[in-house]
Amino acid sequence: MKVRNSLRALKARPGAQVVRRRGVTYVINKKDPRFKARQG
């Protein structure tokens, strides 16, 4: 999982889901797990 300042580019990928857990924003992508990231 990558830590990124901006998740905007990852949100646009096919299969991407934006999830908020305990105030932290994650992008999870089951189609292409390379694009898994958390905002930091």
UniProtKB/Swiss-Prot annotation:
Record's keyword terms, sorted: Ribonucleoprotein, Ribosomal protein
SUPFAM superfamilies according to UniProt: Ribosomal protein L36
InterPro entries tied to this protein: Ribosomal_bL36, Ribosomal_bL36_sp, Ribosomal_L36_bact
Molecular functions (GO terms): structural constituent of ribosome
Pfam families assigned: Ribosomal_L36
Membrane is among the record's keywords: no
Family annotation (HAMAP family): Ribosomal_bL36
Family: Belongs to the bacterial ribosomal protein bL36 family.
Protein name: Large ribosomal subunit protein bL36B
Organism whose genome encodes this protein: Streptomyces coelicolor (strain ATCC BAA-471 / A3(2) / M145)
